[in-house]
Curated annotation (Swiss-Prot):
Binding sites annotated in the UniProt record for dUMP: R21, R126, R127, R166, S167, A168, D169, N177, H207, I208, Y209
GO annotation terms (biological process): dTMP biosynthetic process; dTTP biosynthetic process; methylation
Role this protein plays: Catalyzes the reductive methylation of 2'-deoxyuridine-5'-monophosphate (dUMP) to 2'-deoxythymidine-5'-monophosphate (dTMP) while utilizing 5,10-methylenetetrahydrofolate (mTHF) as the methyl donor and reductant in the reaction, yielding dihydrofolate (DHF) as a by-product. This enzymatic reaction provides an intracellular de novo source of dTMP, an essential precursor for DNA biosynthesis.
Name the record gives this protein: Thymidylate synthase
Subunit and partners: Homodimer.
Primary location: cytoplasm
Catalytic residue positions: C146
Enzyme Commission number, as recorded: 2.1.1.45
Upper taxonomic lineage: Bacteria, Bacillati, Bacillota, Bacilli, Bacillales
Keyword annotations: Cytoplasm, Methyltransferase, Nucleotide biosynthesis, Transferase
Organism this protein belongs to: Bacillus velezensis (strain DSM 23117 / BGSC 10A6 / LMG 26770 / FZB42)
Source superkingdom: Bacteria
Family membership noted in the UniProt record: Belongs to the thymidylate synthase family. Bacterial-type ThyA subfamily.
Length: 264
């Protein structure tokens, strides 16, 4: 995707070398935005092969409100293992905040259900927002949310989504995040009777780890190939009824996978 290669170049050319929590070191910039028209294909990176199974199962895991890695491990997904405790628990991370936000009066708020209800009943609302950044619970999370807030927008029968990501690992994380939120937008559009519009990806601290520079430069030498298509295998009425088997990726022809170490 041209948008992704442009981001890589921007960080390499304009970034500052900074230390970071993990001790790895980064090349970092602050503030950047990419836009993807979901009518033009499913934005899954082609300059390296992505593991769609991990992307899809992680999203389904979020939507279940689950915060234990057991479901992920049972489905061959290991991306959260480094942060889990000995029982597989991560604390009140994404799934908990999306589905069981603890309100000021002790009530539990299902942000996803409320979001879908509001899209259906008040599509012009400017409050179609889900937040994972629960200040009162940050210290209890294994990893505070990197992709921390997203908003939906309905116009001309199309549903668009904008994500704010406070911290973005360009090589490992960002390709997953793009595909995950594009998939979420398409799923919500499906259950609300809308067409997918745009996915807008807005960053705070967007960085390339020092031990990923070689891999990023390799991707910049690779040509951008046509985007794949994503379709659903059946009609689904509820966002919570989707399964992995409902997602069909067609015409995905990426360059080979590139390995990179995770900074924990």
């Amino acid at each position: 995707m041209k948008q992704y290669k442009d981001l890589c170049r921007h960080v390499l050319e304009n970034g500052e070398k900074k230390g970071d929590r993990t001790g790895t070191g980064t090349i970092s910039t602050f503030g950047y935005q990419m836009r993807f028209n979901l009518q033009e294909g499913f934005p899954m990176l082609t300059t390296k092969k992505l593991h769609f199974k991990s992307i899809a199962h992680e999203l389904l895991w979020f939507l279940k409100g689950d915060t234990n890695v057991r479901y992920l491990q049972e489905n061959g997904v290991r991306i959260w293992n480094e942060w889990a405790d000995e029982n597989g628990e991560l604390g009140p991370v994404y799934g908990s905040q999306w589905r069981s936000w603890r309100g000021a009066d002790g009530e539990t708020i299902d942000q996803i259900s409320r979001l879908i209800h509001d899209i259906k009943t008040n599509p012009n609302s400017r409050r179609l927002i889900v937040s994972a950044w629960n200040v009162g619970e940050i210290d209890h999370m294994a990893l505070p949310p990197c992709h921390c807030l997203f908003q939906f927008y309905v116009a001309d029968g199309k549903l668009s989504c904008q994500l704010y990501q406070r911290s973005a690992d360009v090589f490992l994380g960002v390709p997953f995040n793009i595909a995950s939120y594009a998939l979420l937008t398409m799923m919500i559009a499906h259950v609300t009777g809308l067409e997918p519009g745009e996915f807008v990806h807005t960053f705070g601290d967007v960085h390339i780890y020092q031990n990923h520079v070689e891999q990023v430069n390799l991707q910049l030498t690779r040509d951008v190939r046509p985007l794949p298509k994503l379709r659903f295998a059946r009609n689904v009425d509820s966002i919570f009824d989707f399964t992995f088997e409902d997602f069909i990726i067609e015409d995905y022809d990426p360059h080979p996978h590139i390995k990179g170490a995770v900074s924990v």
